[in-house]
Regions:
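Active-site-adjacent substrate-binding region
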Residues: 41-68
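Catalytic-core regions of hydrolytic enzymes
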Residues: 1-46
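Active-site-proximal beta-strand/loop segments in catalytic clefts of secreted hydrolases
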Residues: 20-25, 40-42, 69-70, 86-93
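His/Asp/Glu-rich mid-to-C-terminal helical/loop segments that flank catalytic regions of hydrolases
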Residues: 93-132
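Extracytoplasmic/secreted envelope proteins and their assembly/folding machinery
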Residues: 3-7, 34-35, 45-52, 96, ...
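Extracytoplasmic/secreted cell-surface and envelope-processing proteins
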Residues: 1-4, 27-32, 49, 72-76, ...
Length: 132
């Protein structure tokens, strides 16, 4: 499925939030470590902050950073928040071993979900304040 088809599918199905999850690669196998989050529009920065915050609570996970104004194809959609999560580097043997562990992957995704829940709560609070 092309990126455009994926975007159309999101819009057609009235997606509220899109989180694109990947493994990072590149750099030196010993120097490139950690998880990172990316957003294109500042209005979605808090979603990436919430997700990254929970991922940083995991033992042995380094912070590779949070990048704003990041231009990836899916983030071009402005109808709903869309962010990218790079879990760990598959080009690092130590991180590849972590990613091979199903329990570790599950814990990572549970932390992504916790960040999403926090973001939704923040949106509801902001929405309630806007109505006052």
């Amino acid at each position: 499925m092309s990126i455009r088809e994926r975007q159309d599918k999101f819009i057609e199905n009235k997606v509220d939030i899109a989180i694109s999850i990947h493994c990072n690669a590149g750099g030196g196998p010993l120097s490139s470590l950690g998880t990172s989050t990316y957003y294109r529009y500042n209005v979605y920065k808090s979603l990436t902050e919430d997700i990254l915050g929970y991922l940083m609570q995991m033992e042995g996970v380094n912070n590779f950073g949070m990048v704003g104004n990041f231009n990836f194809s899916l983030s071009a959609i402005t109808d709903f928040p869309c962010v990218l999560v790079e879990t760990l580097f598959i080009s690092s043997l130590a991180e590849e071993e972590k990613l091979a562990d199903a329990q570790f992957r599950r814990a990572m995704m549970e932390n992504v979900a916790k960040g999403l829940v926090d973001y939704i709560k923040e949106c509801r609070v902001a929405e309630g304040q806007a109505k006052k």
